[in-house]
Amino acid sequence: MDPRKLLSCSSSYVSVRMKEEKGTIRCCSECKTTKTPMWRGGPTGPKSLCNACGIRHRKQRRSELLGIHIIRSHKSLASKKINLLSSSHGGVAVKKRRSLKEEEQAALCLLLLSCSSVLA
C-alpha cells in the first residue's frame, strides 16, 4: 500500500475513510487498526470501532447500565490493570457495584420490563 494514500488515523472523526483503488480503508477510533473481520458501531458513529473494541465498548455500556464497574485499562495487554483480591483468593477480578440513582433505577426497570425479564 502506498503510504501517501494512507492518512493518519488521528482525525477527530475517527472512522476515517481514505480513498484507495479498491475501495475505502477504515480506522478504529480506539486502537487505530485498519484490519478487522467486522466493523462495529461506537460512540462516534456506525462502523467506527474494530471488532474487539466494539465488543469491549458494548460490555462497558452494559456494565455501566447495571452499575457495575470493572477497573480495567485496555490500551495494551501489558498495561491491563485489574483490581484483584489477594493472591490467596486465586486472583479473581472484583466487580464494584454502586448504588443506582432514582432515574437510573427507573430506566433499568423500564428496560427489564421491555425485555420481559421481570415477572409480575
From Swiss-Prot:
Spell out the GO cellular component terms annotated for this protein, sorted alphabetically and separated by semicolons: nucleus
- Give a GO biological-process term: response to light stimulus
Any idea which GO molecular function terms this record carries? transcription cis-regulatory region binding; zinc ion binding
The segments annotated as GATA-type zinc fingers are 22-76
User: What domain of life?
Assistant: Eukaryota
Localized where?
Answer: Nucleus
Checking Gene3D superfamilies in the record gives: Erythroid Transcription Factor GATA-1, subunit A
Name the InterPro entries for this protein: Znf_GATA (IPR000679), Znf_NHR/GATA (IPR013088)
Q: Which UniProt keywords apply?
A: DNA-binding, Metal-binding, Nucleus, Transcription, Transcription regulation, Zinc, Zinc-finger
Q: What is its main location?
A: nucleus
Give a short account of what the protein does. Answer: Transcriptional regulator that specifically binds 5'-GATA-3' or 5'-GAT-3' motifs within gene promoters.
Protein family per UniProt: Belongs to the type IV zinc-finger family. Class B subfamily.
- Its recorded name reads GATA transcription factor 23
Q: Which organism is it from?
A: Arabidopsis thaliana (Mouse-ear cress)
